[in-house]
C-alpha cells in the first residue's frame, strides 16, 4: 500500500508526510502507524502522522464499493474500541485521555448520524473521510491506538494471521465490531443499524467468511496485544463472543 509505505519512509527519514488517499477503506491514511507485509504477514509498524490530508471525494466515489464498506466497518469500530479503553482503565491497566476520547466519540457520532440515501452521496463520503481523519488525530493525542483500536481490531489482526488471503481490514473489523458491541452490551443496536442500512452486511455475506476462523481469531486475540486488557482478554467474554458467532441470527446470514 502506497500510503503505508510513504508513512513509514517519512518516519524513518523524519520527513513531513502529506496523505492523498484514493479510497476510504480505513483510517490508515491519517494514523501514525503503518500496515506492512513483513515476511509475508501483515504487520503494524510505527509511522509518521500526516502533516496534511488532501481528499477528492469524486475520486473516493469512483473507488470500488468494497472500499467504502471497509471504511464504514473501520469507522463504526470506534464505538467498541472506546468502550474497551474505558474498561481497561477501570481494570487498572491503562489511563484514558479524555480529550482523545472526546475527539474519537465526536468523529464516530458525527458519522453515524449523517443522513444519506446512498453511500456514494457527497455528504456521506465527506463525513466518512472526515471522521476517519479525526481518528488518527485521537490516536496521536492518546499516544497509542487505544481510542480507535480495541478487541474488534484484535480479532481482525488475528484473522490476518490465520487466513491465507485476509479480507479488507475494515470488513473484518466491522463484523468483529458487531460481535463485540453485543458482548459489551454497548450501542449494539446503533452498530447493527448502520451496518445493515448501509449494505455492509449484504456485502459481507457475499464473501463467505467462516465461523471457525472467527472463533480461532477470538481465542488468539489476547495474544496479539498481551499488554492490553480489552474485553477479549477475559475468558468469559471470549466465550460469549464465540457463542455469538455460533448462534447470532445476523451472523448466521454472513458467516458459513
Language-model regions, residue ranges each:
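A glycine/threonine-rich phosphate-anchoring loop and its flanking beta-alpha core
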Residues: 11-107
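Generic enzyme active-site microenvironment
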Residues: 2, 54, 151
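N-terminal small/polar loop signature for handling phosphorylated ligands or for N-terminal nucleophile
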Residues: 1-18, 117-125
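Active-site segments that bind and position negatively charged phosphate/pyrophosphate groups
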Residues: 99-202, 209
Amino acid at each position: 500500500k502506497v500510503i503505508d509505505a510513504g508513512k513509514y519512509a517519512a518516519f524513518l527519514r523524519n520527513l513531513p508526510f502529506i496523505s492523498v488517499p484514493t479510497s476510504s477503506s480505513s483510517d490508515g491514511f491519517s494514523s501514525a502507524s503503518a500496515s506492512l507485509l513483513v515476511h509475508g504477514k501483515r504487520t503494524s509498524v510505527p509511522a509518521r502522522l500526516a502533516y496534511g490530508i488532501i481528499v477528492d471525494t469524486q475520486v473516493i466515489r469512483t473507488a470500488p464499493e468494497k472500499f467504502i464498506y471497509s471504511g464504514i466497518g473501520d469507522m463504526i469500530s470506534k464505538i467498541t474500541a472506546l468502550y474497551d479503553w474505558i474498561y481497561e482503565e477501570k481494570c487498572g491497566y491503562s489511563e484514558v485521555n479524555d480529550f482523545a476520547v472526546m475527539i474519537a466519540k465526536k468523529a464516530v457520532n458525527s458519522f453515524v448520524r449523517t443522513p444519506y440515501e446512498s453511500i456514494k452521496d457527497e455528504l456521506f463520503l465527506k463525513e466518512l473521510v472526515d471522521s476517519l481523519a479525526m481518528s488518527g488525530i485521537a490516536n496521536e493525542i492518546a499516544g497509542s491506538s487505544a481510542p480507535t483500536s480495541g478487541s474488534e481490531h484484535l480479532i481482525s489482526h488475528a484473522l490476518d494471521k490465520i487466513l491465507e488471503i485476509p479480507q479488507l481490514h475494515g470488513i473484518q473489523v466491522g463484523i468483529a465490531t458487531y460481535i463485540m458491541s453485543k458482548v459489551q452490551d454497548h450501542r449494539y443496536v446503533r452498530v447493527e443499524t448502520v451496518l445493515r442500512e448501509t449494505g455492509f452486511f449484504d456485502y459481507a455475506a457475499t464473501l463467505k467468511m467462516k465461523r471457525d476462523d472467527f472463533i480461532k481469531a477470538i481465542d488468539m486475540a489476547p495474544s496479539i496485544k498481551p499488554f492490553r486488557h480489552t474485553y477479549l482478554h477475559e475468558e468469559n467474554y471470549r466465550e460469549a463472543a464465540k457463542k455469538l458467532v455460533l448462534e447470532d441470527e445476523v451472523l448466521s446470514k454472513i458467516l458459513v
